[in-house]
Amino acid sequence: MKITVAKHAGFCFGVKRAIDIAEHTALNGKTYVYGQLVHNERVIDDLKKKNIIFADNIEEIPKNSVTVLRAHGEPGTTYEELKGKNIENEKLNDATCPLVTLVHNVVIKLKNNGYEVIIFGKRDHPESIGTSYHIKGKDTFIVESPDDASSVIEHINKNKFEKVAIISQTTMSVDGYKKLIN
């Protein structure tokens, strides 16, 4: 039997980049990673063998520790909390995916231009949480499924928004997004 591996098999470039940043940082000693870099236990176990310690919350990270932020992006409050632990500048390696950063920049520009921004994503996913922060609203409307399109329309009509933009968490389905906006 012949097995062919897809040309684009493996991690997306944002996750690959985050793993590379964590591994490179850990060459200089103990490194904390805030959150999961990747949803793959084998890879996490391999990284733990390389001076990398994963922290699910900031309280687990000691003051003055070298820290890497995951690819999903973080709300500004994360940076503020880390700064309070003297974790900034050369002690902080931000591995946010460039595509996620691009979404954050687009969202800021849309909000500054008077748009109500709706997120197509998972409410509890770090990327949607971080994007929501950049919209500057705890009441950011997040729709998780294209089947919830009626709730989006209801939200728009109820609030009488003049300009609306719907953006997507980068890991959501393109087909789902198209279904939602149509």
Predicted regions and their residues:
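The feature marks the mature, well-folded catalytic cores of soluble enzymes
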Residues: M1-N182
